[in-house]
């Protein structure tokens, strides 16, 4: 399989130049100002932006068990439309991803679909019971496991969480933390996030584990995590497009953690500009409109993530496309141990072609995802994905 990409403006975390890319057997084989090959498929980019495809550190595909909301196929196709070729899926499926059988189902289905790379998280505690860690022993020799997560139901017992972090460190896993204190989750969601953030940061320092703080949304939580990172703690920090693109004043849409105040958004953007944020994760969480009307928290995000982040960060706040590529591609690839996220010879040929000058209007009826739950309906942003390439194959084309 060969593909020649011509006339691209090539951008990744450290590069920005015009050139061509030759792909062979799924990897980048040659990069130059001009490349000519006979009898190969050619994609003419017409000087549009070509970046490493995005990798989502945080998504929910609802499969198995909740597939009226989303499934592995619809979620993967939505990812491709959004420019993503890799996702890390949370464990709150039905049954919960606490057993080899459930994890193998996801892997087998993903391989059968052959659309994107899917990393399935294991639940921190067995079936989210908050206390049992024995199931983690099943995965100690499974080198495909990259992360364990409590997203959906946090681990309230600090001793259990510390032990889980120690197990994660022993196995070179990332522990993904959904910081929400159950004592405050019904009364004050700001305190709920801040209190659990403080705890998990302290446990991360104590255990030495790599702890990934998911969907950080308050200025206080940011300050706590950044201080620990500066002290050398092995912590990575994730924010979402909706916590960048919305404030409570614009749309107090129900997500968890909630849409925050203007000053929180300003602090997130400031932290991005200072290089203190590691990844942007969508927290793609599809629900039916009926479920949303009854208060289910969450929103779809894969198909809108890039235009929101590009518009809010690059066009409005002066963040470079290089930095955005770092947040959406390079750092997520490093986090998940993937040979992707940059444009260099020998790297997997996962790429996205984008028209950054094209204005789009969010229309949920055009989503490939089964979910239509978005607070961005009717809003306009810049940046349209024209094509997504996975292992040298064009998997999505506008």
Swiss-Prot record:
The cofactor note from the UniProt entry for this protein is:
Binds 2 Zn(2+) ions per subunit.
Q: Which residues form a coiled coil?
A: none
Residues reported to bind Zn(2+) 1: 58, 60, 151, 283
So where does substrate get bound?
Answer: 60-62, 92, 256, 287, 297-298
Tell me which residues bind Zn(2+) 2: 151, 178, 215
Which terms are listed as keywords in the entry? Hydrolase, Metal-binding, Pyrimidine biosynthesis, Zinc
- Pathway(s) it belongs to: Pyrimidine metabolism; UMP biosynthesis via de novo pathway; (S)-dihydroorotate from bicarbonate: step 3/3
Would the keyword Metal-binding be found if you checked this record's keyword annotation?
yes
For this chain, one GO molecular function annotation is: allantoinase activity
Please name the PROSITE patterns in this protein's record. Answer: DIHYDROOROTASE_2 (PS00483)
**What family is this?**
Belongs to the metallo-dependent hydrolases superfamily. DHOase family. Class I DHOase subfamily.
Its name, as the record gives it, is Dihydroorotase
Give the gene symbol.
pyrC
